[in-house]
Structures are given as structure tokens and as C-alpha cells.
């Protein structure tokens, strides 16, 4: 029976939140796009609506329709998963959930203190820096313009939103209620207060608060899923432009990873990987994988992305066209390489990259298994009758030596 529906706006976010339940042995399924809630056999269903880059009205409609379906199918709790850096259509999607659910209020706990993302006096911080002054404030696709959470919400909706003081209850309030949390203990305390009189019909937040849902919903039996043995060879496929990920790749390269940057043509020429030049490039990549146990293939140019921007401008490709074109090309490359005997464990970073790669091999569903690090998810899917594993990571997660540590751990496991 479906006990919890989680609605995410991108693929990596769907996984890093769903794994908070799956890691406790709770049957959890992650799907992209449409979902038949009446036919779902999992206890937890996470739906990636792919609305992060959509206009606000379209994003709201997708969330509203899914929420109405959940209400009609008697789902006990709906959790709107938001980005822990507040990217995307935050206000529009929260308002849509509240409206379609018919709930009196929507508790919103945006913090993820476990990785240094806190909400204090209504302001959202990334490791002590207001989010709009952090790297997320200059994100080329979804820059976060405001750190005060209620103001950010009101950029897209007129639904009332207010920040609650520590210890203040939601019982007599309406609208979107923003909770502070500087520590994981703050999130846990807020959760216990919210669940005092039963399960709230709607909640919102990121993976930070979702980590407490197994206990709060009474779904956890105390078990912990163990990490399966993985192929010690590691290929990192990076489509993220986040500075955190760029530093991680620099560190990995210095530690001996072989690093390949795709050219502007490889990223943006339609059908490139099916061309003679593309097939030759694929053969060279296979040789690289055969000769090197730790590899990176990335979509960033050396020293910035001006070369790709110039290439796109000369062909009339706008910023969104670049985003879609690059992730699509990476997906085509991935599909062509997927059957290679030299392909070991995969780590995909960036939600668009993950989606296109999974599309290329016909995988619409992923099953989160466990977290290797906070926000770093091991998931599995079925391909041609075989179970395949993939590691997923949002661009903004992890320490600088993350890739090196993961590679070492996989090799020793």
C-alpha cells in the first residue's frame, strides 16, 4: 500500500530524498513523469516531475494534477521535495500542493543541516553564506535571487507564507509555514511536534527532513541496507557546472583520474555520436576506459565555458538550448558506451545528465539502495534482464576529495 508520495522536480533530487526511506529497507520506487498511483505496489513512491526548468504555471499544473491523484487514491501523506539550495519553482509548486490537497497549511522545512544548508530567522544559508550570495546565486540556469524564504516563495505566489519562531506550532495557522533549522536536532524536534496529533497530510522540504520520515511515519524497523559489491573501475560522467563539482574533478585529476573534456561540437552538434567522427571518438573513449580504472568525462571546457558559449552563439543556440543539447548529447554518448565491457561503476552528476543517460537505455524507473555519502546515492535498475548499479550526485554536494574517497572505497569493498 502506498503510504507516502514524494514529488521532486529533478532526478537526482528524487533519488537523494527517496533513499532516506530505501536505506531503511522500506520499499521505495523512483519514476520520471507520469505515475499510476492506483497500481503502485511500493510503500513509498517518488515522482520526478521534471519541472525545475519549466515556467512556473506549467510546474504548478504538474504538481497540482499529481496531488489530486494522490488525494483521490487515499495516499496518507504527500511530501513536496524541494531543492536544498532553493532552485526551481519553489513558490509555484508549494502553492499548487497546498491548493490541490485542500490542507489548512503546508509545513515547509527547507534546511539540510547535515551538509551545511541551514534556515535561520527565515533566511536560507549555504555553509553560513546567504544562498543568493553562494555559488547557487550565479547558477547559469536557475540562479537563486533571494535568501529570505518567504520572499522567495512570494516571487511566484500570493498564498500566505510566514516564518515560524522556534517552538511555535502550526496548529492554528494557514498558508505555507517556513521552519528554521540550524541542526539536524532542530529538524527532528520540528518533526516530532508536527506529528504529535497524527500524520500531516502535506509536508515540504528536502532530503534533510526526509531523513526523519521513516521514524515519524512508523515505517522503519531499524534495519539498515548494506552496500553491495561494486565494480572497482569508476567512470564519472559529469554534466554539472557547479563550482563544487569542478573542484572535486580537479582534485580527482591530481590524484590520478584520467579526465576527458567533450568538445563544443561533441556536445552540441545534432547526431554527432552517430557520425564517422563520433564513432571514432567513441572508440578512443573505449580505449581510455580499458587503459584507466578511474576516468572522468565532463561537459565543461577548460578555464570556463566560453568556447562552448561561442560555438552555441554562432549557431543561434540559446542558454536553454545549450542545456538541453548538452545533456541530450551526453545521453546519446552514454547509450553508445553502455554495452562496453570496459564500463565499470558509473557515477552520474547533474539531474539533466542522469535523466538523459537513463532515457538512452530505456530506464524510466530507478530503485534507490543506500547512501554512500550524504546526498550521494547508489541506485539500481534492470537492463536487458540484468541488475545494473549507478551512483548519482547533485552538482552541489560533497567535499573536494569526494571522488577520490569514493573510488578508494569501491576498490576496497
Residues covered by each model-derived region:
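A structural-propensity feature for long, helix-poor, extended segments
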Residues: 43-50, 293, 380-413
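C-terminal structural cap/anchor segments
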Residues: 288, 292-349
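Conserved, well-ordered active-site substructure
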Residues: 343-402
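Short beta-strand segments
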Residues: 7, 46-48, 80-81, 107-112, ...
Amino acid at each position: 500500500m502506498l503510504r507516502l508520495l514524494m514529488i521532486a522536480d529533478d532526478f537526482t533530487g528524487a533519488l537523494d530524498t527517496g533513499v532516506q526511506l530505501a536505506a531503511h529497507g522500506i520499499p521505495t520506487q523512483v519514476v520520471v513523469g507520469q505515475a499510476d498511483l492506483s497500481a503502485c505496489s511500493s510503500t513509498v513512491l517518488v515522482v520526478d516531475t521534471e519541472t525545475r526548468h519549466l515556467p512556473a504555471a506549467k510546474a504548478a499544473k504538474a504538481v497540482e494534477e499529481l496531488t489530486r491523484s494522490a488525494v483521490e487514491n487515499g495516499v496518507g501523506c504527500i511530501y513536496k521535495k524541494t531543492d536544498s539550495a532553493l532552485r526551481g519553482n519553489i513558490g509555484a509548486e508549494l502553492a499548487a500542493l497546498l491548493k490541490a490537497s485542500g490542507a489548512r497549511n503546508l509545513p515547509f522545512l527547507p534546511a539540510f543541516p547535515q551538509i551545511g544548508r541551514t534556515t535561520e530567522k527565515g533566511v536560507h544559508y549555504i555553509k553560513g553564506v546567504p544562498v543568493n550570495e553562494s555559488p547557487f546565486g550565479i547558477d547559469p540556469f536557475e540562479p537563486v535571487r533571494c535568501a529570505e524564504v518567504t520572499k522567495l516563495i512570494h516571487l511566484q505566489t500570493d498564498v500566505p507564507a510566514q516564518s515560524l519562531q522556534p517552538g511555535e506550532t502550526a496548529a492554528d495557522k494557514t498558508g505555507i509555514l517556513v521552519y528554521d533549522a540550524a541542526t539536524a536536532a532542530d529538524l527532528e524536534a520540528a518533526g516530532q511536534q508536527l506529528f504529535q496529533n497524527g500524520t500531516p497530510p502535506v509536508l515540504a522540504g528536502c532530503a534533510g527532513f526526509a531523513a526523519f520520515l521513516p521514524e515519524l511515519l512508523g515505517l522503519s524497523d531499524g534495519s539498515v541496507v548494506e552496500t553491495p559489491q561494486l565494480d572497482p573501475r569508476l567512470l564519472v560522467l559529469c554534466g554539472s557546472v557547479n563550482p563544487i563539482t569542478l573542484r572535486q574533478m580537479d582534485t580527482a585529476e591530481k590524484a590520478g583520474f584520467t579526465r576527458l573534456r567533450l568538445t563544443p561540437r561533441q556536445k552540441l552538434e545534432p547526431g554527432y555520436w552517430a557520425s564517422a567522427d563520433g564513432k571514432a571518438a567513441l572508440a578512443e573513449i573505449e580505449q581510455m576506459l580499458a587503459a584507466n580504472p578511474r576516468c572522468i568525462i565532463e561537459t565543461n571546457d577548460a578555464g570556463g565555458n566560453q568556447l562552448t558559449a561561442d560555438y552555441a552563439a554562432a549557431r543561434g543556440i540559446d542558454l536553454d538550448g545549450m542545456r538541453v543539447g548538452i545533456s541530450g548529447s551526453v545521453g546519446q554518448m552514454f547509450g553508445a558506451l553502455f554495452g562496453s565491457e570496459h564500463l565499470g561503476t558509473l557515477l552520474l552528476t547533474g539531474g539533466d545528465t542522469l535523466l538523459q543517460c537513463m532515457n538512452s537505455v530505456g530506464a524510466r524507473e530507478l530503485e534507490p539502495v543506500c547512501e554512500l555519502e550524504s546526498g550521494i546515492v547508489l541506485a539500481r535498475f534492470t537492463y536487458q534482464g540484468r541488475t545494473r548499479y549507478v551512483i548519482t550526485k547533485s552538482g552541489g554536494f560533497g567535499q573536494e576529495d569526494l571522488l577520490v574517497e569514493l573510488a578508494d572505497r569501491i576498490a576496497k569493498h
